[in-house]
């Protein structure tokens, strides 16, 4: 056989997701958003506050607490622009959900180790004026809906790309799809869009200290409406 050792290397979920990536055009995504918005109001009485805080242009990190698998969909519905999502690479292999998140613009990220490719790609997207969703908890919240400790990656990326953060509080989502259940339940859900958080590096701070301070502020803002 003449195959090189590189071609024989096993492919990860992230590799497969990258090679099969196909994002729907914005007009199609907006139609899907309208349909999903109607379904979300019907089944979960999803409501929104603070929509005036949404920037429809310019680079922005959209950061939220993470209560259920449906969070990224609910978060995106008020937008009329392209959004990218950092999603667990393994989720691209799930039936139905894997295809949907790929069509809607999700990018794979390996959560068990530093994924420099995903981080570099996201940072460039932001610098080009794009919007990207990041869940600072790194996973779903506690069963009672309370926050996990926030990782500093979102704030660090915002500092590097010189972009603001749009904090979002999702309230009630943990009752829709509790951990251990295979299907969602009916429950009221509310999303609060807070004013933009403009990250800064203060005099005398290094990048790590600034990112941690901004992360703590982000967590405090999101927790204020839980």
What is the predicted role of each segment?
Residues 51, 65, 88, 137, ...:
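Generic beta-structure capping elements
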Residues 1-28, 117-226:
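Non-catalytic C-terminal accessory region of glycerolipid acyltransferases
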Residues 52, 114, 171:
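Residue-level "edge-of-site" marker
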Residues 48, 85, 106-108, 165-167, ...:
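Conserved beta-strand scaffold positions in the cores of enzyme catalytic domains, especially
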Residues 3-56, 95-104:
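A transmembrane-helix-recognition feature enriched in membrane-embedded lipid enzymes
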Residues 27, 31, 35, 71-74, ...:
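Hydrophobic alpha-helical segments typical of transmembrane helices
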Residues 43-45, 82, 103, 129, ...:
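A generic structural signal for alpha->beta connector loops
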Residues 41, 54-113, 121:
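Catalytic core of membrane glycerolipid acyltransferases/transacylases, capturing the structured
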């Amino acid at each position: 056989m003449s195959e090189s050792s590189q071609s024989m290397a096993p492919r990860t979920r992230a590799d497969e997701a990258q090679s099969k990536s196909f994002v729907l055009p914005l007009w199609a995504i907006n139609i899907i958003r309208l349909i999903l918005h109607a379904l979300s109001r019907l089944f979960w009485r999803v409501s929104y506050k603070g929509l005036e805080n949404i920037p429809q242009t310019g680079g922005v990190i959209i950061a939220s607490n993470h209560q259920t698998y449906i969070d990224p969909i609910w978060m995106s519905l008020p937008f009329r622009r392209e959004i990218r999502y950092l999603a667990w690479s393994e989720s691209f292999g799930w039936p139905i959900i894997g295809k949907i998140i790929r069509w809607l613009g999700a990018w794979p990220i390996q959560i068990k180790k530093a994924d420099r490719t995903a981080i570099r790609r996201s940072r460039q997207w932001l610098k080009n004026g794009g919007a990207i969703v990041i869940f600072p908890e790194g996973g779903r919240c506690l069963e009672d809906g309370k926050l996990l400790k926030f990782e500093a990656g979102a704030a660090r990326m915002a500092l590097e790309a010189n972009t603001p953060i749009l904090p979002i509080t999702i309230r009630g989502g943990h009752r829709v799809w509790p951990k251990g259940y295979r299907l969602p339940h009916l429950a009221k859900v509310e999303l609060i869009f807070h004013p933009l958080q403009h990250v800064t590096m203060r005099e005398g701070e290094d990048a790590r200290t600034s990112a941690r301070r901004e992360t703590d502020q982000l967590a405090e803002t999101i927790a204020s409406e839980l």
